[in-house]
Amino acid sequence: MRSLLSFLLIGVPVTLILTLVGLTHGMIEDSQQRQRGSGADIVVRGTNAAAAINFSGATLSEKFVDFLQKQSHVEMAVGVLSHNIQLPLTVTGIDLERFTAMAGGFTYIAGGPFRKPNDMIVDRYYSAERHVHAGDTIMLMNRPWHVCGVIEAGKLSHIFVELKVLQELDSSTGKVSQIFLKLDNPSNTAAVIQALKEKLPEYPIYSMEELTSMINVNNIAGVKEFTWVVVGIGVVIGFAVVCLSMYMAVLQRTREIGILKSLGGSNGFILGIVVMEAMLLGVGGTLLGIAMSFGAKWLIHTLVPASIQMAIVPVWWPIALSITLASAAFGALYPGLRAAHHDPIEALAYE
């Protein structure tokens, strides 16, 4: 029973570490996938756009859409407006016909396209998380919206409304957040970007691959630091659990330790036994923590599939194991040294 409890207490910080890393990777991968789902080859943003991962704010005139549409090799230029409602969720205003032509169309699970100004399209993740269905009315941005359709996920946003309607609500008439360009041939991307930067040197212009590569852990303030704080907490918990568990084990096995000492067991041999048992506890706790991280992913995907995404990151499994084993080894030192220095006569007399 003591060992099972130790496995659990060691497994919990392992689960926390793997879950935090999985959330970071999952949300980054989801954002990258949805950006690629737009079908664009190039993204143009406003001159006062913030970090590369911030897609909200109306900073571009719609006139640029027509200007960019006329550029060489540009097959389609589409402006969108993003409005943050509840991080990390945004409402995206689109010209439905042009956006779906660029993105390859929406796959409707239920309902259909916009028909009225207050119509809203949501993807299946938002539908599952908020329990909304085609035909329902929901409140967002202090007004009612009619959910006219539910689509498959992966097309830029979880929530879509008519561009003109969102511009009016956002007091951004004639403005968009970013402009997506689809080229006649993706191989022309570098040449088109170079030409555009010569004409619009003050505007951030990215290829889709460049933009998605910017959506990473290094560009999200505080994530790396917070991850290592959690790792540090995991080390402390693992050390304390193993130290207490092995200390109790040594107390319970005082007589057995005395027998080993009387049979010629060296201090190093006794210490090695204690450390080995601690390492086994560490391995077992890590395996349990990995298993529980799959449970955490299932729970997150079931409860909040639109707001939070979690990925399983196997590359962190050996890192978690190394952290746990190091904690176990250090945690076993004091109990092991105490056991190694037991007087065999006192140990055999212990009841």
Locate predicted features.
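Hydrophobic alpha-helical transmembrane segments of multi-pass inner-membrane transport and secretion
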Residues: 1-27, 221-259, 279-288, 330
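A short beta-strand structural signal in non-transmembrane regions
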Residues: 42, 126-127, 148-153, 174-200, ...
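Hydrophobic secondary-structure segments that place a key small or acidic residue at a functional site
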Residues: 81, 89-95, 107-165, 175
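Hydrophobic, regular-secondary-structure patches
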Residues: 11, 15-90, 194-198, 204
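Peri-transmembrane interface segments
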Residues: 31, 194-240, 249-254, 259-260, ...
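C-terminal membrane-exit region of the final transmembrane helix in multipass inner-membrane proteins
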Residues: 313-351
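Hydrophobic alpha-helical transmembrane segments
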Residues: 3-7, 291, 314-322
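Transmembrane alpha-helical interface segments in multi-pass membrane proteins
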Residues: 234, 255-301, 319, 323, ...
